[in-house]
């Protein structure tokens, strides 16, 4: 079984915020698969589907972002998921332009509290992850107020595009492997100004 976890905060007030783009990505995957993510299980909302030949559990932890690891640990244990091979975590990245994604097979949390909670709970950095860029158009307007505020109307088209891109990338990871997905999507989304050293870490 593959476990796809989107990170975010529960509650309607956070529903369409940059910090919840992981939840939105899981919802988009579910929509494309024709399923709902509405079963409460292991401190998360979950839904089952198939992608290719794989059984997939979609999950949105309800523990709030900073305690996401509690739910992910429970899901991994209860479904006997290999956390290093069969878990994919999707979350927001304030340092990436809105509309871009980055896929990594492993690494630190880079300061993201939700990802750090998962690393702590699983006791490994060997966790596949996909970061979705949510940076504001004006860098001076970033920070907590921005990521916990609603997306602006001018951003919605790009949000829609990146959610479709995330769903495509998940399909590639599951069906063709993470190396193929990294090669295809990281290069496709690479900003011209990004230096080569940084690109090799992704």
Give the role of each language-model region:
Residues 112:
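Glycine-rich phosphate-binding loop at the start of an alpha helix
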Residues 2-106, 115-130, 137-142, 149, ...:
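Nucleotide and nucleotide-moiety/phosphate-recognizing core
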Residues 109:
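Conserved TIR/SEFIR loop-to-helix hotspot centered on a Trp-containing motif
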């Amino acid at each position: 079984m593959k476990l796809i976890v989107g990170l975010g905060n529960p509650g309607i007030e956070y529903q369409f915020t940059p910090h919840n783009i992981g939840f939105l990505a899981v919802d988009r995957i579910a929509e494309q698969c024709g399923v709902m993510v509405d079963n409460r299980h292991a401190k998360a909302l979950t839904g089952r589907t198939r992608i290719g030949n794989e059984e997939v559990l979609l999950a949105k932890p309800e523990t709030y972002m900073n305690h996401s690891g509690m739910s992910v640990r429970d899901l991994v244990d209860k479904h006997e998921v290999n956390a290093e091979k069969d878990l994919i975590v999707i979350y927001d990245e304030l340092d990436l332009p809105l509309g871009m994604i980055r896929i990594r097979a492993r690494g630190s949390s880079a300061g993201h509290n939700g990802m750090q909670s998962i690393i702590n709970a699983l006791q490994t950095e060997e966790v596949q992850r996909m970061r979705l860029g949510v940076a504001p158009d004006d860098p001076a307007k970033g920070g907590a107020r921005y990521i916990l505020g609603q997306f602006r109307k001018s951003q919605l088209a790009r949000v829609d595009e990146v959610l479709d891109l995330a769903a495509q990338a998940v399909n590639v990871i599951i069906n063709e492997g993470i190396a193929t997905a990294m090669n295809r999507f990281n290069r496709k989304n690479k900003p011209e100004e990004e230096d080569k050293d940084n690109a090799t870490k992704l």
